[in-house]
């Protein structure tokens, strides 16, 4: 049972009509990231599937774990914020190991949690801002 106050429907009545346009814009930004960063062997981007396009609430790349912190520090020095939205794999969360008493080893998930970096992505991100971000990513890996 969920009860909504009157403010939530008012907010949704404004936001929902914009959902498709905002999602389309994020998809366009993600496609542009893919194009601009496609020649970099030093990063991995997630696969894109034609029959199931992402909504790109995040745009996550993977870099080697040994350079991730330095890479993020470099981008921050250029005014580019990044995130690590999934820093711990499910198999290593305390709820999994301590409370559920599940002992499982998921090497790929654990590796991914050490390599992921989320780049800025939001519908208002301009081409100029995205060019700036990508130029600095490329510069970092060409040094």
Identify the function of each model-found stretch:
Residues 1-143:
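PLP-dependent aminotransferase class I/II
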